[in-house]
């Protein structure tokens, strides 16, 4: 049984492997004439509700800068794809875990394939935060294609 995907969702972070996923998705979308959505998640702020948060405006600035940087990167990817005559929608989700955000957006846009890098974080961050790719693989009701470096 062959599957022809109609709408591909690509989840990115700041890792080089996620940009490789965009390149793979671009080729697949062109071959299949599929819609393409590129997304990023600004995760739940771990300092919400902590007294320290009130005295640390730098933390608020950090999240505002992270959001601005993510939106700029999405816009840059969208513009690069447009130069190659490929239209892509971009989405930035805030305040949820990455895996929840990815699955939510896939449902929201009607994606029938999720593409993402095999990992974004390494070392202790990966251990503490868990594997986003593994969580999406486990929870997604649609196929997930993991891109390796």
Residues covered by each model-derived region:
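A short acidic, glycine-rich active-site loop
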Residues: 57-72
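Hydrophobic alpha-helical membrane-association signature
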Residues: 21, 70-73, 98
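Small/aliphatic-rich secondary-structure junction motif
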Residues: 2-57, 80, 84-89
């Amino acid at each position: 049984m062959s599957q022809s995907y109609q709408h591909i969702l690509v989840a990115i972070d700041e890792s080089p492997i996620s940009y490789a996923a965009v390149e793979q998705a671009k080729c697949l979308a062109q071959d299949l004439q599929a819609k393409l959505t590129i997304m990023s998640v600004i995760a739940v702020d771990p300092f919400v509700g902590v007294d320290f948060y009130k005295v640390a405006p730098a933390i608020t600035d950090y999240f505002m800068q992270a959001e601005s940087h993510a939106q700029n990167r999405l816009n840059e990817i969208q513009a690069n794809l447009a130069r190659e005559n490929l239209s892509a929608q971009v989405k930035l989700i805030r305040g949820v875990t990455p895996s929840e955000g990815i699955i939510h957006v896939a449902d929201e846009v009607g994606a029938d394939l999720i593409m993402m890098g095999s990992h974004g974080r390494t070392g202790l961050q990966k251990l503490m935060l868990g594997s986003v790719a593994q969580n999406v693989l486990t929870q997604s009701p649609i196929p997930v294609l993991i891109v390796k470096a």
